[in-house]
């Protein structure tokens, strides 16, 4: 079954999503959450940390593997979702809502895909926001 991809978000080839709001929120796609399996530990950048597009800024550990969290943008982290640190499974349960990871003031963007481009590349299904 194809995983949902929200139409109002943009995506990196590393499976992170970026919202259009300011500051922008970052999370992992349902495609990534499904591939990871049950997320059991999350390491996020701290508020105030500088992140760089295409560079690791944290880790997601699941029952299957440990994966780098790669920032889709360059900027400064302004907020971290402590709820996913306390309850990492929220990423699997609601990757586009309560499972967001951090918010960032964007200085520059990496190579981002539209929802349609991401869905075509990773065999997913675009759904309305």
Where are these predicted regions, by residue range?
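Charged, amphipathic alpha-helical coiled-coil/dimerization segments
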Residues: 74, 78-79, 85, 92
